[in-house]
Amino acid sequence: MSEQITFATSDFASNPEPRCPCILLLDVSGSMNGRPINELNAGLVTFRDELLADPLALKRVELGIVTFGPVHVEQPFTSAANFFPPILFAQGDTPMGAAITKALDMVEERKREYRANGISYYRPWIFLITDGAPTDEWQAAANKVFRGEEDKRFAFFSIGVQGADMKTLAQISVRQPLPLQGLQFRELFSWLSSSLRSVSRSTPGTEVVLEAPKGWTSV
């Protein structure tokens, strides 16, 4: 009986480059309806376009998307070369705690796949964008974020769109939550793609000095 080769295993065999995984954790609750969700969708297109311009990032950066309102894996981990931005629609409430837990589980599972296939990897990034407050229990998820950061299992970033509960975000993320200026999603994703490209050009395990956020937030 022939052994089946999964897509992931085949991908690792054809591309043994170290991986730089990033999960976008996106709030698509009802309050994002209208211009906010449209600008978010446009930002995702900018994100892909800028990654496409970097041949090394195409091989090394992997992207996943988890949306919440309700929690849904919009995009399992895939290479930047195979990333096609979904068109997101706003609906539902803001189950942020469950969404964070899902993203953390996806990151740990992907790291297991890397190790099983002999693929080195950079510390995963989890990038939360929200315009509201959690409508579910989030404290357990926050504890997991803090423990994971302490153990350097991932780097967790949080961005607050206008209306976001920044005080709660500060209790979830070790790093200071950053407010998005207006609806500057394209500028935000341009910075994110630049940061991931910088990381992907480094050696796994080394510290990378990131470009200071500008044009989309006030620090």
From Swiss-Prot:
Domain VWFA as annotated: residue spans: 21-199
InterPro entries for the chain: Tellurite-R_TerY (IPR011392), VWF_A (IPR002035), vWFA_dom_sf (IPR036465)
Signal peptide annotation: none
CDD domains from the UniProt entry: vWA_subfamily
Official protein name in the record: Uncharacterized protein YegL
Originating organism: Escherichia coli (strain K12)
